[in-house]
């Protein structure tokens, strides 16, 4: 039983999984939206923090909800998702530039000075590539 109160239950569960499930490749977080907007924003933003807090090399962490899948990135990534999917990209780093391939609306010139800037996009290829200008944190949301 965790007694510390510096972190929320989601973070405690992720930390427990990383410490106790050796060889783990993927962590799926379910039920993290809680039916409340503030709960959803808080828990999804924590996904980005996990890339800083924990050594996630070779470990995929994603939040699954009725609305889709959300996962953090901290470097250039290419992933398979198929064409026609809704995709949104969020980052708190307004100095970050993300060059994209496989999206209907390229993100190359997006200035991430507000969360809505790269939302409501569509995938147009089997694979999406997001090239970050520097290591940072961002969230990807797929329907």
Named regions from a protein language model:
Residues 1-2, 54, 59-61, 84-88, ...:
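A glycine-rich helix N-cap at a beta->alpha junction
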Residues 1-52:
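Acidic/Gly/His-enriched mid-domain segments of enzyme catalytic cores or analogous surface patches
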Residues 23-26, 58, 84, 127:
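A general structural motif
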Residues 27, 61, 137:
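Hydrophobic anchor at the start of a short beta-strand
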Residues 31-34, 63-68, 91-93:
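Generic secondary-structure microfeatures
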Residues 38, 49-82:
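Class I SAM-dependent methyltransferase SAM-binding "motif I" and its flanking Rossmann-like core
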Residues 42, 52-54, 114, 130:
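Short alpha-helical interface elements
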Residues 66, 73-143:
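Long, charged alpha-helical interface segments
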